[in-house]
């Protein structure tokens, strides 16, 4: 039984150390039968083990671990280890794409972050800085002194208030923009209010001559009624109203007030029922013209808009007045 062991031993072992370690195990009488059975049973695996052993020395002989186990009759653990190692490599070779898993996790994180951003609808903003009353007081004081801070001043102010330079800079920017808006708002109503004042100035002036005429002439209502009727027939005298108003005061002092009645007598050919009411205000007509004489300096621009009130003066055209004495 020992004879067949001899040829098997060199086939299983390539190193001298392993052979020396095997011989004592074979010579043990109690284990000889067990070793024989193990070796015969392993004869079928001899080719496989020989291949592994041949690969083992070629790959590296520094670890002679598989050879002693095969020599000692433990073929299954090495086969199991080899097969397991092969299975391990084979089974985990595809998942060896662990970097893709990491990438997937990273992409998941990115997607999560993207979802958070998309869920918010906008990017996260920094919280708004809340200034204390003391800080605002100091900032406003400094802003009243100067609207722009130099770098050293800004650093000093930020350090004294416990703020960052960026916060101080942004506060001053916002304060300057607010100040400009306030200035524009203050200037806008000023210009607009100036126009109503300019436009409102003539209104009192316009009312004052009316009141004066109404006070100067008790029959002003009749005069105001007559111009309303005389406006349609003659609009041409309106441009001559201004020169006549300036010239008319010159004639009444000369005692030409009686001839002023003649134009009214000549003009009423348009309307015959109006001369009687018009004759009554004629005597005070010079006095009425004297009142506008004193106020003609203020309301010359107003006469264009209120021609009907001065219509009785154009009736005293210088041409008619001068022609009447000649006749």
Curated annotation (Swiss-Prot):
Q: In which tissues is it expressed?
A: Expressed in the embryo in limb primordia of the head and thoracic segments. Expressed in regions of the larval leg, wing, antennal and haltere disks that form the distal-most regions of the mature structures (in the leg this corresponds to the tarsus and the distal tibia). Found in the optic center of the developing larval brain.
Where along the sequence do coiled-coil regions lie? none
Give the compositionally biased regions (Low complexity). 231-249
Which InterPro entries does the UniProt entry name for this protein? Answer: Distal-less_Homeobox_TF, HD, HD_metazoa, Homeobox_CS, Homeodomain-like_sf, HTH_motif
The organism named in the record is Drosophila melanogaster (Fruit fly)
Q: Name one GO biological process term.
A: regulation of transcription by RNA polymerase II
Q: Where is the composition biased (Basic and acidic residues)?
A: 266-275
Protein name stated in the entry = Homeotic protein distal-less
Q: Which GO terms describe its molecular function?
A: DNA-binding transcription factor activity, RNA polymerase II-specific; RNA polymerase II cis-regulatory region sequence-specific DNA binding
Q: Which UniProt keywords apply?
A: Developmental protein, DNA-binding, Homeobox, Nucleus, Transcription, Transcription regulation
- Disulfide-bonded cysteine pairs: these are none
Q: Where's the DNA-binding part?
A: 124-183
**Which Pfam families does the UniProt record give?**
Homeodomain
> What is this protein's function?
Transcription factor that plays a role in larval and adult appendage development. Specifies the identity of ventral appendages (including legs and antennae) and suppresses dorsal appendage development. Involved in patterning the distal-proximal limb axis. May control the adhesive properties of cells during limb morphogenesis. Also has a secondary role in the normal patterning of the wing margin.
Name the segments for region: Disordered: 181-303
Domain of life according to the entry: Eukaryota
Which residue intervals are annotated with compositional bias (Pro residues) in the record? Answer: 276-286
């Amino acid at each position: 039984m020992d004879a067949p062991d001899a040829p098997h031993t060199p086939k299983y072992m390539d190193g001298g150390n392993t052979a020396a370690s095997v011989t004592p195990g074979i010579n043990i009488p109690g284990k000889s039968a067990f070793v024989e059975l193990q070796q015969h049973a392993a004869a079928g695996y001899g080719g496989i083990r020989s291949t592994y052993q041949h690969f083992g020395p070629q790959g590296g002989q520094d670890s002679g671990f598989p050879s002693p186990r095969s020599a000692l009759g433990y073929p299954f653990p090495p086969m199991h280890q080899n097969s397991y190692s092969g299975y391990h490599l084979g089974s985990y070779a595809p998942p060896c794409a662990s970097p893709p898993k990491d990438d997937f996790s990273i992409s998941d994180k990115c997607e999560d972050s993207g979802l958070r951003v998309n869920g918010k609808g906008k990017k996260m903003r920094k919280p708004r800085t809340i200034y204390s009353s003391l800080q605002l007081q100091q900032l406003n004081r400094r802003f009243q002194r100067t609207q722009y801070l130099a770098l050293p001043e800004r650093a000093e102010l930020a350090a004294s208030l416990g703020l960052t330079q960026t916060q101080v800079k942004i506060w001053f920017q916002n304060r300057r923009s607010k100040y400009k808006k306030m200035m524009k708002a203050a200037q806008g109503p000023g210009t607009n209010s100036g126009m109503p004042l300019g436009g409102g100035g003539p209104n009192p002036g316009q009312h004052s001559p009316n009141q004066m005429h109404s006070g100067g002439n008790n029959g002003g209502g009749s005069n105001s009624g007559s111009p309303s009727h005389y406006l349609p027939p003659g609009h041409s005298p309106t441009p001559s109203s201004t020169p006549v108003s300036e010239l008319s005061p010159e004639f009444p002092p000369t005692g030409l007030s009686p001839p002023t009645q003649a134009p009214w007598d000549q003009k009423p050919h348009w309307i015959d029922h109006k001369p009687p009411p018009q004759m009554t205000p004629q005597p005070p007509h010079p006095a009425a013209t004297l009142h506008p004489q004193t106020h003609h300096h203020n309301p010359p621009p107003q006469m264009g808009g209120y021609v009907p009130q001065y219509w009785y003066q154009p009736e005293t055209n210088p041409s008619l007045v001068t022609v009447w004495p000649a006749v």
